[in-house]
Amino acid sequence: MNITFIFILIFGFFNTQKCSKDYDHFDDEDLALSIPKNAIGVPKEFRQQVLKEMKLRNRPNDILKNRCYCNYDQSICGNNMTCVKQDGAACYHAVEEVYNKAEKRMETLHKWGCATLERGSGASHLTCNSWRAAHHSPKSIGCCYEGNYCNKNLIPPAYVHHHKEKALQEKTDNPEDYDSPLENMTRGGKMFIMVFATVMSVFAVIGCIYLCITRAEEKSKARARAKTVSLKTESTYMESKSMLEDSGSGSGQAALIQRTVRQDLTIIKTIGQGRYGEVRKALYRGSYVAVKTFYTTDEDSWKNERDVYQTNMINHENILQFVAADIWSEEDSMTKMLLITDYHELGSLSDYLCREETLTTDEALRLIHSCICGIEHLHAAVHGTGSFRKPEIAHRDIKSKNIIVKRPNVCCIADLGLALRYQNDKILPEKFNVQVGTKRYMAPELISNKLNPKDFSQFKMADIYSMALVMWEVAIRVEVNTCEEVLTVDETSPDHSASSGIGESVSSSGNISRMHLQKTNVEGHSTSLKAKQHVPPFDGIVHNDPNFDEMNDVICVRRIRPPPDLAWKNVPALNELSKLMEDSWHSIPHFRHSALKLKKEMAELIKNPDRQNQSQRKVEFQQQDSGLVESATNQS
């Protein structure tokens, strides 16, 4: 280590001597002006690059507007004393008072050229404002952006913080003070700088090595912990086996967050088009994914959806699984933002309902139940171990096109670009528009702009209204071709009297024999429900793209809702479902069911779809039994 340190010191000392000998005073003039070295223009490469960029941007007529007058040598300015600036950059005219040692007098040095285009500002502000600072010798610079040799007759501003007469006297009396700064440095000062720089470099290298070793150890420990957890939990093993086979659930963040994901994507085809961009099917490391593309004008929506997907404990069976987010520049030089999720072949719920195949009652109930489970998970605040906590989330754009069918009878909620989070007693993002979403599915309080944005529960109730319309879309695709089971009395039973229903119903032992019931298919009681073609809510009532005034008249003033099918009353499950719809799209938000209430009701309806008939039969049995007992008592 000591030998290496001494070698570095010796090498630095000789390198300093070489720099001192080769120092060029003309370069010092440019550096003192704070003009970047490539501001003057690079002879051929720079001109070719600018011309190439202009051709790519289809603006060949702008070349004349980018030409500046240049008085440097031919290698920089070319044959016609011209340099070409970038779009947005400036042409400059710089002046400096230089002391002529041979003639012992001050001379004004003029320089014309092209300034560089600074990153971030889209102009040449730093170069053009360098005259405002004090310099070792009088300097100034003037800029113009019009091009077309606008700097040729440009007059720079007056010198700042320096008087010409005083500068001339100082240079005449003490010309050695205006030599190169490196020449005025003592040999001891140079050595001190070299030693200090070398020592700091050594410490920096040691620090970097230490950080690399520490991070490697932390990653190794993290992998070991993850491996231990995967051996203990079967769900984690299934998730690692196939990331795209099942969305799974968990308390961590989403699967991948990388800036290099696009390089591993192989785009296959376009599968959809939305208001923010397009959705394409792609292959990512051997698995199919859906790539949602956002344009730069919708960057806020991309950031919000990415942040929602990265929320702790967001993973759920009925929430579309997030894979990664990335920013990429396509071949057309347009920057696009990518959001990558699981790909599901069945597509959206709207596409699924448009198929020729109809739904059974059980299929419809399970599709609706899975959607409500996803919404309930979004609406609920989940507290995990430690600091893990999932905030309440309102979707704000529930519709059949934003619901994906993962597999038969199972849906998941997608498109969280407009979602809001209620975290730490405040709504995120802090700046948002209240009246957003699809107008056809918007709740009355949103259409009439009466929703209180400070009450987060009202956003969740608006989701319930939208979900009720989706429930109606699913229900109209149900087709039932069965005969209803009707309770009748067996008139041939010896224990039954045709006139009163009592007769010889009491045996000699005093026991009451129950009325004989049988299931028969009675003409006029058959249930035949034909499925209707899938249409969006309020189809035929409003236009394809209704405005707020039209929707306000329909759902707020006239209070129109999608009509239920009259045949639903003959199907117990659909009859109960229609009641849930009516409660959920109520005009008053607080009268609607919560997502948790709907989730429980749908689970019970799936478990017991004939509960309405059974409850009616139970009442009939109780009435019949009470009538028999009363008759028997009177006879006795």
UniProtKB/Swiss-Prot annotation:
Keyword Transmembrane helix carried by entry: yes
SUPFAM superfamilies registered for this protein in UniProt: Protein kinase-like (PK-like) (SSF56112), Snake toxin-like (SSF57302)
Compositionally biased tracts (Low complexity): 497-510
Stretches of the chain found on the membrane's Cytoplasmic side: 212-636
Pfam families per UniProt: Activin_recp, Pkinase
Chief location of this protein within or outside the cell: membrane
TM annotation in the entry: 191-211
KW Lipid biosynthesis (keyword) present: no
Bias type Polar residues, positions: 611-636
Residues in compartment: Extracellular: 21-190
Enzyme Commission number, as recorded: 2.7.11.30
Summary of subunit composition and partner proteins: Interacts with sma-10. Interacts with drag-1.
Family listed: Belongs to the protein kinase superfamily. TKL Ser/Thr protein kinase family. TGFB receptor subfamily.
Protein name (database record): Serine/threonine-protein kinase receptor sma-6
The organism of origin for this protein: Caenorhabditis elegans
